[in-house]
Regions:
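Conserved NTP-binding catalytic cores of kinases and kinase-like/nucleotidyltransferase enzymes
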Residues: 1-50, 56
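Second-shell loop/turn segments in exported
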Residues: 36-42, 128-133, 160-161, 234-235
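Middle-to-C-terminal accessory/interaction subdomains
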Residues: 150-154, 159-168, 178-180, 200-205, ...
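Conserved protein kinase catalytic/activation segment
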Residues: 189-204
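Gly/Thr-rich phosphate-binding loop signature of adenosyl cofactor/nucleotide-binding cores
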Residues: 83
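A conserved hydrophobic secondary-structure block that centers on an alpha-helix together
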Residues: 37-76, 151-156
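ATP-dependent phospho-/nucleotidyl transfer catalytic cores
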Residues: 88-179, 255
């Protein structure tokens, strides 16, 4: 006797909408919104789940996930990853009071003045964002912030960023995106909210299927694909200031010492894979990636080792003599 509840269902996803196995957004009568992702391009099916777990561990509030088996009109549709939506309920459950919420829906959400495709000035500096919640001035405030990033200089720029950006959260989020290799996550696929008390912007992860050594189509990619600074106009302006470069470098090192290690990730990834292994074998839509599934834990751990070595080498090259991080850290940790 399962529970029966009314719900509204719609397709979700970008290129995956064309796949035979669809992904869905579920809105229950209670107001709970869930995403059921087919994860068709990820042979492990755990990259989103592992990324959100990792982000949570390093201090970035992230969606909760769980695997589910879906049947449609009595017909088995296979295994899905259920992902909590980033919405009012998400913030309420975490005690975060917020003023507005936007989704970075495409790569125009890059904190730049020009459109990434046409290279012409954007019609609105808020292009690329999907308005979710807020007031009539939400997009105006965002446009003013982005405009200030490119108009202000030196101490005035630094003051404006400090006033409007939660730098601690930003550095954690940036480090997480960089270490997991989420190439698409710097200019889109994130949630941007304004904290109600401070008025500062916070940034949260949204879609991390392309990570841990594979791109968003599931193809292997090099561990040095994503540079340690990430990619967007906000980060570029933040890193004009040496003290903020140092803070970010120290955050990267802290995470590589504590959370981004084979010893920490291995048991989590292994547990996730073991939990879904029997269901993956029963899902006909996953037949093409079944062979790869068995090697995904080793693949992910190999990526972590390579990524750690690359990031540490790049930190030395990027910072030079500007900062003096501990010699042991810059030389590489024991798990490398």
């Amino acid at each position: 006797g399962g529970r029966i509840s009314g719900a509204r269902i719609r397709y979700r996803g970008g290129h995956t909408r064309e796949y035979a196995k669809k992904s869905y957004e579920i809105q229950l009568e209670s107001g709970l919104v869930l995403h059921w992702n087919a994860e068709s391009d990820d042979p492990s099916m755990i990259r989103n789940a592992l990324s959100f777990h990792f982000m949570e561990q390093i201090g970035v509030p992230s969606p909760r996930t769980r695997p589910v088996w879906l049947s449609v009109s009595g017909r088995p549709d296979g295994i899905y990853l259920e992902i909590e939506a980033v919405n009012s309920r998400f913030f309420s459950m975490r005690g975060i009071r917020y003023r507005s919420l936007l989704y970075a829906a495409n790569d125009s959400a890059n904190f730049e003045l020009k459109d990434p495709e046409s290279r012409r000035r954007k019609r609105s500096l808020a292009d690329g964002y999907e308005f979710i919640e807020g007031d009539g001035d939400t997009l105006v405030r965002l446009s003013d912030f982005i405009g200030g990033l490119h108009r202000l200089k030196d101490s005035r720029l630094q003051e404006a960023i400090e006033e409007r950006l939660d730098l601690d959260l930003y550095f954690k989020w940036l480090a997480g995106a960089v270490l997991t290799g989420n190439y698409d996550g710097f200019e889109q696929n994130y949630a941007l909210y304004e904290d109600d008390a401070s008025g500062r912007y916070g940034i949260l992860p949204w879609d991390y299927e392309g990570s841990w050594g594979r791109n968003c189509f599931g193809k292997p990619c090099s561990a040095d694909l994503v540079r340690i600074q990430g990619y967007n106009g906000l980060t570029r302006r933040v890193f004009q200031f040496p003290e903020w470069r140092r803070r970010y470098a120290e955050e990267l090192e802290r995470i590589m010492e504590t959370e981004f290690t084979e010893e920490r990730i291995g048991p989590v990834a292994g547990g996730m894979l073991e939990r879904i292994a029997s269901a993956v074998k029963l899902d006909p839509a996953r037949a093409a990636t079944l062979k790869a599934f068995g090697g995904e834990k080793a693949f992910i751990l190999a990526y972590i080792g390579k990524r750690r070595r690359f990031v540490r080498a790049e930190l030395k090259r990027w910072l030079g003599n500007e900062v003096s991080l501990p010699r042991r850290q810059l030389a590489g940790g024991s798990s490398d």
